[in-house]
Design a protein with these regions (language model features):
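Structured beta-strand/loop patches that form or line metal/cofactor-binding pockets in enzymes
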Residues: 1-45, 49-55, 326-329
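Conserved, mostly hydrophobic/aromatic
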Residues: 3, 34, 41, 70, ...
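A cross-domain feature marking catalytic cores of carbohydrate-active enzymes
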Residues: 48, 133-135, 161-163, 190-194, ...
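Shared catalytic-loop signature of beta/alpha-barrel
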Residues: 70, 212, 223-240, 245-342, ...
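Glycine-rich, aromatic-flanked loop segments that form ligand/cofactor-binding clefts
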Residues: 93, 103-139
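Metal-dependent enolase-superfamily TIM-barrel catalytic cores that perform enediolate-based chemistry
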Residues: 122-235
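Extended hydrophobic packing segments that form well-structured cores
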Residues: 351-368
Length: 368
């Protein structure tokens, strides 16, 4: 079996409303669908979410690097030669989500060729993941209303509150209102997307002490090394690295330097192969992980479920899997369903991300 052709298809699907957080705002999913074809007729699929304000990638740059840089190197290789593929991808610096999509699409090819679900090939620990829902920048009362609605409609009982606003009282108030309205049995954690300084983050933790918050993700820029380390040392809850740890090397640096003591894994930027390496490092060091969301479509969310459910350590916490609900449509032929607060893996060969051809034709951006 050889790689015969690689496609990178730009497409755009609007969000029902703008998604706002400390590092930016998005109004539509300007993503790239990656498809890898083999000479045996197999097609592997993955989704690529550009995040220019986080990783420097754009829709155009992803299409270009996939088709002009990676495809010429990968065509003719056996998809099962995974280490050789990784060595070729590493030759080109940066471009994490382009590399991640190629890796996931190749795992999809391998699963289909072997007639086995990829979550089984990876580890097969469980068949579902609990879902965490992200709450964006809104007045506190509206945040509580949304959380209660998602708990009632989908059974979700874990919420990630986007923070990093000024004045700090906006986020402090939101934390208190959510805890009072949701009760003590609901998990709430924070993600500041580098919106605060280390001192501001410490102040927020002081003013929310006793609310039972479970984690604080990317409170400040990891470049504030001393402030970040001081925050980790004095915080009673884990400080999670996310944007600061896109690669295995970054994870090693942040953990060993004391800049983070928990790690967010995002398959969109690491693929399944590097995500496994990151998970193994964290397990060896006794560090908790969360499965994050790159504002993923259903295609991307299914990839996260596939990886997260494969291992005990990655399935302990609820994964960030509901962002696709903010989209007006999706490319997945068989939509994901959240039932009793969880999403199940697909018990089919590969990842199971069959694409609706009509919808792809409607939303693709590379044809007039």
């Amino acid at each position: 079996m050889k790689i015969e052709r690689i496609e990178a298809i730009p497409y755009s699907i609007p969000y029902a409303r703008p998604l706002k957080f400390a590092s930016g705002e998005v109004t539509s999913a300007e993503h790239v669908l990656v498809r890898i074809y083999t000479d045996t007729g197999i097609c592997g699929v993955a989704d690529t979410p550009p995040r220019p304000y986080t990783y420097g990638e754009t829709q155009d740059s992803i299409v270009s690097v996939v088709t002009k840089v990676f495809a010429p190197q990968l065509i003719g290789l056996d998809p099962l030669d995974r280490s050789k593929v990784q060595q070729l991808l590493r030759r080109t610096v940066n471009n994490p989500t382009a590399k991640g999509a190629l890796d996931i699409a190749l795992w999809d090819v391998i699963g289909i060729s072997l007639g086995t679900p990829v979550h089984k090939l990876l580890g097969g620990f469980t068949d579902s993941m609990r879902v965490s829902h992200m709450l964006g920048f809104k007045p506190a009362a509206e945040l509580l209303e949304e959380a209660l609605r998602f708990r009632e409609t989908y059974g979700i009982n874990t919420f990630k509150l986007k923070t990093g606003r000024r004045p700090l009282s906006l986020d402090v108030e939101a934390c208190h209102v959510l805890r009072e309205g949701l009760g003590t049995d609901t998990e709430i954690y924070l993600d500041a997307n580098r919106g605060w300084t280390a001192n501001e983050a410490m102040e927020v933790l002081r003013r929310t002490e006793g609310l039972g918050l479970s984690m604080l993700e990317e409170p400040c820029d990891a470049g504030e090394a001393l402030g970040r380390r001081r925050l980790v040392q004095h915080s009673s809850i884990p400080i999670v690295g996310d944007e600061s740890v896109p690669t295995l090397g970054d994870v090693s640096r942040e953990l060993l330097s004391g800049g983070s003591n928990a790690i967010c894994i995002k398959t969109a930027r690491s693929g399944f192969t590097e995500a496994q390496q990151i998970l193994g490092l964290c397990e060896g060091l006794g560090v908790d992980v969360t499965m994050g969301n790159q504002i993923d479509t259903q295609v991307g969310s299914l990839a996260t479920v596939t990886f997260g459910a494969a291992f005990e350590a990655s399935s302990r916490r609820a994964g960030e899997l509901s962002n696709y609900l903010d989209m007006t449509d999706d490319l997945l032929a068989e939509p994901l369903k959240i039932h009793d607060g969880a999403i199940r893996v697909r018990e089919v060969p590969g990842v199971g991300a069959a694409i609706d051809a009509d919808k792809l034709q409607r939303y693709r951006q590379d044809r007039a």
